[in-house]
Amino acid sequence: MFLKQNKFKLIIFYLLLFFDNTALSYDEKNFYYNFIDKINTFSSKFIQHTYDENGTIIKKSSGNLIYKKKLKYLLEYSKPNKVKFISDGKFITTIDEDLEQVIIQNQKKFYGNIFNIFTNKTLIEKNFNLTKSIINNEHYLKFTPIDKDIYYNIFLIVISNDKIKKITFMNDFDQSVTMIFSDFMTNEIILDSLFKIDIPDEFDVIVDNKKE
């Protein structure tokens, strides 16, 4: 879920083969910025594939994602393990049902969060170069960090028919992760109460207030 923030490393994703590495024109950048500006909320089912450095799938996961500006989201994995990541905009709470454990952390600790990046126009303009390719009327956007020694790894977004179809990024373990979305819905009414946590009494709770 989170992008790696230390020394710049990455696996060359197979999707990069399709890119012409042409910097986006003003209109093309506006295409993406207009796209994210129009989205106040979205929800989707997803299937997630995690690959090792040889490109072999080592884990398949599935679940649901609900997002609301700014930085409120519920990322719920249902298979193979039941884990929830809940952000109320200030804190990220991880609920692991198998471990019966809850971890509460400051949102600022995860500034490299994939959702924080691709929905934040100011952050993108300041820290990333965008390149694009259009294949079968689908927009493939590659985000390359300007400061490769400090900031985030490359990540890719595929947009089709005004919907996010796929995201590919690196996780904290140098593994390539691809999230494939389905039933993608935008601008539905989502109440803030959805992002409040309900912790079972028998769960262990760990609070980490560190910002870094």
PLM segments and residue spans:
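Classical Sec-dependent N-terminal signal peptides that target proteins to the secretory pathway
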Residues: 5-25
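N-terminal leader/targeting segments and the immediate start of mature chains
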Residues: 22-58, 71, 199-212
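Extended beta-sheet lipid-handling architectures
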Residues: 44-48, 60-62, 75, 87, ...
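Beta-strand elements of well-folded, non-transmembrane domains
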Residues: 50-52, 67-71, 147, 161
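An acidic-aromatic
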Residues: 64-113, 174-177
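Gly/Pro-enriched, hydrophobic low-complexity segments
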Residues: 91, 123-209
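Flexible, surface-exposed loop/linker segments and immediately adjacent secondary-structure boundaries
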Residues: 99-138
